[in-house]
């Protein structure tokens, strides 16, 4: 990671008053809008250098596929242009080397809060070597990949649940519901968020975790989730394994009921977080006061 900033970076909860199901089902993808138009030659060179570094993504066999780039959350739909994973990886890893325009972009992703049959949310600790290595994350998460010219967040979250927790569509389809969309400035990502309940005990669910992506699993009781978020939404310092990334906080906040969410946000903001509500209009955040 690049130099960590001295305070928590903003977490924007978009379109709080809109029905999440309507938003996530109305996705407009325009491939003619490309984030490359914002990048200078120097930034393009840095992206190539980071991607092709010894022991970097290319050397590890990663592919720089097409991803969604958030443009707008207004007019009853989500609008995206396109970027590539190499662009996202370099800018999220070392934001300080990029222009303010690039630092204010959000690349599409998905994240899910999974609740076990015996009442525990699963919080995962990412493995070493991933972009958010050793940090605490939601139950399952990943990028919003453009497939056959389309962004399909329902497909993406099912793919991530299968990839990271070996949960089949049959196991999640009856309870998997969208909860909203956010923008997390720490890793320049905008996740469409989901929650689901599974007919598996915590022990059974933990046994399914894929060690390629998940280093460790933390069970958090349903009623304990607000205080867990408050305690662990802190700067990573020398203990990244105790620090939630912004995306995870966005996912779990949207899994809470309104009163619990308001309590958690109020306490986190008083402790130094910057969580706010609004919309993303033509590439800029507009706060709802």
Model-inferred region functions:
Residues 1-138, 143-159, 167-289:
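N-terminal leader/linker segments that precede catalytic domains of diphosphate-processing enzymes
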Residues 162:
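Juxtacatalytic substrate-recognition/specificity segment
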